[in-house]
Amino acid sequence: MFLTQTFIYTLTPKFDILISGGGSYARAEYTNFFTNEYSSKNRIGFDSLWLGFIDTGDSIADLIPQITFQTAVVQREKAINQTKNFYLKSQSLQASLRGYSDPVVYSIYTGFGYNQSRKFKTLKIEYGNSIYVGGDLSIILSPKITLDLGAEQRFQMKQKINGYQNSEVRSIPTLSLGSTYSINSDTAVSVNASFGGSSASPDSIFGISLWKKF
């Protein structure tokens, strides 16, 4: 289970500061090979903190361009029995175009994710970079409710451990379906489910988001 908190602070009408932090809860279950005794272990911890910006350009033929950049200030990762913090090791850059045609709000986007290698005591892990392209569609059903649809195609580059390749380039298609309900002009809640289209992606991810304007 994951929990992510995102803050968007508007400096100017076309420039926003983006801050995002996340943590997770995981439960590991074990069965003793010799005694067949069951045991479990719970973990709650901080995972990452990202900092970036959103730059909105002037409209082009009724489409609004945006550039979003983020860098991982800190990421907490575990390999075998070592947990280590990594600083400024991952960055992402995304370009998008947003448009509106009653009753639909839509966007298309493409992006690139960059990962530097991670060095542990006995391991050097190179996760590989990623590129992706996708689109989102929100159908306005009423003044308070939208139906949200999305599709994305991502390619994850080869991964290496201690210089040895242990994965090929992976194609990761996903589809998403959800809905957003506006409680008032400052607050909205949304539910979302995404479904993977390959063995390299999770079968399904379900999420609930709360949006609040201060």
Segments from the language model and where they lie:
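Outer membrane beta-barrel transmembrane domains
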Residues: 30-32, 127-132, 136-214
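Residues on the lipid-exposed face of transmembrane beta-strands in outer-membrane beta-barrel proteins
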Residues: 5-9, 48-55, 93-99, 112, ...
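Outer-membrane pore/translocation modules
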Residues: 22-126, 168
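Transmembrane beta-barrel architecture of outer-membrane proteins
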Residues: 1-2, 44-50, 88-92, 130-132, ...
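Transmembrane beta-barrel strands of outer-membrane/channel proteins
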Residues: 19-23, 67-75, 108-114, 135, ...
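Repeated loop/turn-to-beta-strand initiation elements of outer-membrane beta-barrel proteins
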Residues: 14-19, 58-65, 103-108, 143-149, ...
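Subset of outer-membrane beta-barrel
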Residues: 1-49, 137-140, 146, 194
